[in-house]
Amino acid sequence: MNIEKIMSSLEAKHPGESEYLQAVKEVLLSIEDIYNQHPEFEKSKIIERLVEPDRIFTFRVTWVDDKGEVQTNLGYRVQFNNAIGPYKGGIRFHASVNLSILKFLGFEQTFKNALTTLPMGGGKGGSDFSPRGKSDAEIMRFCQAFMLELWRHLGPDMDVPAGDIGVGGREVGYMFGMYKKLTREFTGTFTGKGLEFGGSLIRPEATGFGGLYFVNQMLQTKGIDIKGKTVAISGFGNVAWGAATKATELGAKVVTISGPDGYIYDPNGISGEKIDYMLELRASGNDIVAPYADEFPGSTFVAGKRPWEVKADIALPCATQNELNGEDAKNLIDNNVLCVGEISNMGCTPEAIDLFIEHKTMYAPGKAVNAGGVATSGLEMSQNAMHLSWSAAEVDEKLHSIMHGIHAQCVKYGTEPDGYINYVKGANIAGFMKVAHAMMGQGII
């Protein structure tokens, strides 16, 4: 494999798409050795086919705001790869959304979904529409207008979206309702639905729950008990909430959360009503965490900074891509962090990842750590297909088993001669091998 040649070609075809190119390069570096052991992959040009999406839909979304003024946004759906199942991946509503971000997320999703062992391909979609500051009626009208274009490309065996940043249960409900009206079918075409119409128990907290199950497995490989360990978390939405809830349940102490305005440090631990307050902060729509310090004496708000300067045993990025950089990694390493688990997608910069691996710090990438969310989406698809509903305990048990299996795959492919587990390499190889063999088995298409 000539990585330099492949990347040069992609950079020429997709200039400026930094997030997408970063994601592709990371995977290629990890799989180079094993790819070169399979000449049949090169003959079938597996890499060249895998790094480009099957198709991309870009469309205008026109809607009317509460003032009666016409607004326009861009909508996207990237159907990346369906070698192992229907396209599966969330929809993101945020002002920062662009094609590069969605292609990176769809590419990552392809491998993440493969790791779950469930039959799901990779995809991602979204819009540069931001729900922040919008009324409920405006959000409903936008979701309906968005689906007027996208519905024709979706289906339970074709492409199954879910939520993501800016898209929660409310937005999924509005989109599913419009899809149902347009198709006149009630099928499992969306996941993350309300419990009353086909949703799965523990789906909102599944990404955070699964992340902690994975991190706990990482610690156990070193004989370390998570009980009593301090945890630094970024973000304060559903993912951070789920992570904080499960970390506390496992006996750890969460000491930070963060938002665009800065971070909260609570040495007494964020548990009980404090965890519930995270959801109140998110529901307020203000996108700030500063009010936490006013609500709970003994905690401190640090404006304009990220939580990685706090001494903690475990660091869990739960907010967005590239939120933990090289300087942050140095701070964590200097503070003797035991484990870093990306619960956000591509939460660490390449420089940060290199530093963790160089210092033999336990680090695992988002495609493995945060796979609990899409795994539970897959379980929701299964429940919809069988027209039944599992209990929370059943779903949680299956989620725990899936995360245990993902960790085992990472250990299998990522263990180095000195015993260090390179989870980046392990996750990339495990996901790639499944997708590559599936593509080989289906011919040149």
UniProtKB/Swiss-Prot annotation:
Reactions catalysed, as given in the entry: L-glutamate + NAD(+) + H2O = 2-oxoglutarate + NH4(+) + NADH + H(+)
EC number, UniProt record: 1.4.1.2
Keyword match Disulfide bond: no
Enzyme category, top tier: oxidoreductase
Stored Pfam families: ELFV_dehydrog (PF00208), ELFV_dehydrog_N (PF02812)
Subunit and partners: Homohexamer.
Protein name in the entry: NAD-specific glutamate dehydrogenase
Species assigned in the record: Bacteroides fragilis (strain YCH46)
Name of the gene encoding the protein in the UniProt record: gdhB
